[in-house]
Design a protein with these regions (language model features):
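Donor nucleotide-sugar binding/catalytic pocket of nucleotide-sugar-dependent glycosyltransferases
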Residues: 127-172
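Membrane-proximal helix-turn-helix segments that form the acceptor-binding/catalytic region
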Residues: 75-76, 108-131
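Conserved catalytic-core segment of nucleotide-activated headgroup transferases in glycan assembly
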Residues: 8-32, 157-226, 231-246
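A charged, aromatic-enriched C-terminal amphipathic alpha-helix characteristic of glycosyltransferases
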Residues: 168-170, 313-348
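N-terminal pre-catalytic "stem/leader" segment of glycosyltransferase-like enzymes
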Residues: 1-61, 65
């Protein structure tokens, strides 16, 4: 039995599962691998540094930090024939573009702090040869900036059996009902104010009189507040968030054009679609790879106006099964795990 340890550099030390990034990049893969006979555990970089954890075969470091003790342990693993992989789901290592990051642009960190964070992340990256990433643009950027020869495998975020079972439970057992005409926007962090502002006029025009549900930290533009029935709810727990998604007919996911956003995952589509929602989204590469009658892609303001109108007006005419099956077939975690296993086998042949 192969033993796999996922190590995440998350600030959520007590309950890392509720960090969405850790859930997708560590727990979801671990659950699927456990089903296939692997022995998998998830821990934090804090625990990895503090304890002797050297009895695993494969180590996956999610967003690895630059810390002398941490790096020494990683080097020991590499020198002792362990399979060592760095995993990224965000462009946290690109010093050249650090000041274009939402961390800096949202004012959550000073220029000095942002450059320090990105410099340390970049320094950590240079100690790894093998990488898994959530999107193709992320992989391309690692190839571009790496100083040594590297190998990168794209393992997309995908739907898990656990997420599907939550949605199915809401659909069949709890009978959570759609709120007619409700359009939802789900913001995990305060960094999305500008994204929403870019499409505010389109929302106000195409969704006038409809309920707009905003969940999480976001400043709702005045033009939307005047035109729509706005409901705002603070950030909620994971299961409650899924329930709120399931009450929406349409979920929107606007993003401004930037190198950082182009590297983001398209999970907003498949999470919402499997919950029975149509989706209007900016076609970042990881959204653009999906096709569905219930996915409406928009970039310009006029495209957003049209897409919002089409999504809201066509909701009842598109079978719920189309939304669910499209998401299930195109965001299949079993296919992603197969890619991961092939990559690990390739590494194993090289390090043995």
């Amino acid at each position: 039995m192969k033993k796999v340890l996922f190590v995440s550099h998350t600030a959520r030390l007590n309950r890392p599962y509720f960090d969405p990034s850790v859930r997708y990049r560590c727990f979801n893969l671990a659950d699927e691998l456990n089903e296939r006979g692997y022995y998998c555990k998830v821990t934090t970089s804090f625990e990895f540094i503090k304890n002797d954890i050297s009895n695993f075969d494969i180590y996956v470091f999610h967003r690895p930090p630059f810390d002398p003790e941490f790096i020494d342990k990683v080097k020991w693993l590499q020198n002792n024939g362990k399979i060592v992989i760095a995993d990224y789901d965000d462009l946290v290592f690109d010093i050249e573009n650090a000041l274009s990051s939402s961390l800096y642009k949202s004012g959550r960190a000073s220029q000095r702090d942002v450059l320090n964070i990105f410099s340390r992340n970049s320094a950590a990256l240079n100690y790894f040869k093998y990488f898994t990433v959530s999107t193709h643009p992320l992989g391309a950027r690692i190839y571009e900036i790496s100083k040594e020869e590297v190998d990168v495998c794209v393992v997309h975020n995908a739907l898990t059996e656990k997420y599907k079972s939550i949605c199915d439970q809401l659909r069949f057992n709890e009978a959570v009902e759609k709120v007619k005409g409700r359009v939802g926007y789900f913001s995990g962090t305060k960094s999305h104010d500008k994204d929403l502002a870019l499409v505010a006029d389109a929302i106000a025009e195409s969704c006038a009189g409809k309920e707009l549900l905003f969940v999480g930290p976001i400043d709702v533009p005045e033009v939307i507040q005047k035109a729509c029935k706005v409901t705002q709810i603070p950030l909620v727990g994971y299961h409650e968030m899924v329930k709120l998604i399931a009450t929406c007919e349409v979920v929107i996911a606007p993003l401004e054009s930037s190198i950082f956003n182009s590297c983001k995952s398209g999970l907003k589509y498949f999470e919402s679609a499997y919950a029975g929602c149509s989706v209007v989204a900016t076609p970042i590469p990881d959204i653009d790879r999906f096709t569905s009658q219930s996915l409406f892609k928009a970039t310009s303001l006029d495209e957003w106006k049209l897409a919002l109108k089409q999504a809201t007006e066509s909701f009842e005419s598109i079978p719920e099964s189309e939304r669910i099956n499209s998401a299930k077939e195109q965001a299949n975690i079993k296919l992603e795990v197969e890619k991961w296993l092939e990559f690990v086998n390739k590494i194993s042949a090289e390090v043995s």
